[in-house]
């Protein structure tokens, strides 16, 4: 069974738990959580991840800055990134994709939509 390690970057503990709980449905998954982009970069420097899922609106370092930094770092640039946006936040979603995000999921998060998006990313990476 393949194993996947996901980095969930979200400032809301409730939303982080919701996303992590959904990802646990993927067999062989390990989930690591970060509360903002700075925390995410620390975790990236210490562990290998298969997919990063990041909220856009966060304190200290937002998800758009994180996407940009990941894409511009040779160590992390090939890790798929899924941005999580508020429904109707078309500008932020488009900016995330233009900065190099592979996909997006809108809030409120529908578990099946999240899992479908993650599974598509995993399959394309294989």
Range-by-range predicted roles:
Residues 53-55:
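Active-site T/S-Asp motif of two-component receiver
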Residues 13-32:
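Two-component/phosphorelay signaling modules centered on CheY-like receiver
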Residues 58:
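Receiver (REC) domain active-site loop signature in two-component systems and cognate sites
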Residues 33-51:
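Acidic, metal-coordinating helix/loop segments flanking the phosphotransfer/catalytic sites
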């Amino acid at each position: 069974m393949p194993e996947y390690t996901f980095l969930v970057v979200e400032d809301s503990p409730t939303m982080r738990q919701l996303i992590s709980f959904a990802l646990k449905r993927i067999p062989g998954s390990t989930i690591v959580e970060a509360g903002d982009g700075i925390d995410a970069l620390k975790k990236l420097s210490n562990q290998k991840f298969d997919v990063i899922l990041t909220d856009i609106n966060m304190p200290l370092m937002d998800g758009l800055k994180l996407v940009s930094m990941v894409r511009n770092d040779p160590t992390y640039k090939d890790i798929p990134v899924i941005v999580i946006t508020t429904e109707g936040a078309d500008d932020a979603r488009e900016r995330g994709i233009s900065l190099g995000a592979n996909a997006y999921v809108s809030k409120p998060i529908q578990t099946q939509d999240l899992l479908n998006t993650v599974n598509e990313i995993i399959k394309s990476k294989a």
